[in-house]
Amino acid sequence: GSAAVIPTERFIYVSIEDCAQGGKVPLDACSKAIDHALLDHDNLAIKFITLADCEKAEGYDRCERVAERHYRPRLMGYHFTVKGQATAVPLYAGKKGATVFRDAAGATYDWQRTEGVKFSPQAIRKVEGFVVAKRKH
């Protein structure tokens, strides 16, 4: 007999609560996947010496301080892949505007154009909010 094929679903969420409310991933799996993504964020996010350098590369109000001497892009959400077990990748605001996230490797996720990725309304509002904040300054 042939092996059962488990379909892969992909979602973008901004928090554990957002993930759990989406109804596709159990709360404990959301929490475990996001904990793993936070470790990836600590290890993979590019680090800058100054806030000015970070904001020049990432945009206004899109950086956070790390320890005493570094800045890195602020985490904006999580790209979940669900195929039997949920895994999550940390996402950052994209440089192209309100509709785009990117991961540490530079891959982009555009909620208006990305096929097969379902974005939560909270994820969309989160990115839009940062673009609005950027325009105010």
Regions found by a protein language model. Give the residues of each.
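Mitochondrial intermembrane space
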Residues: 1-137
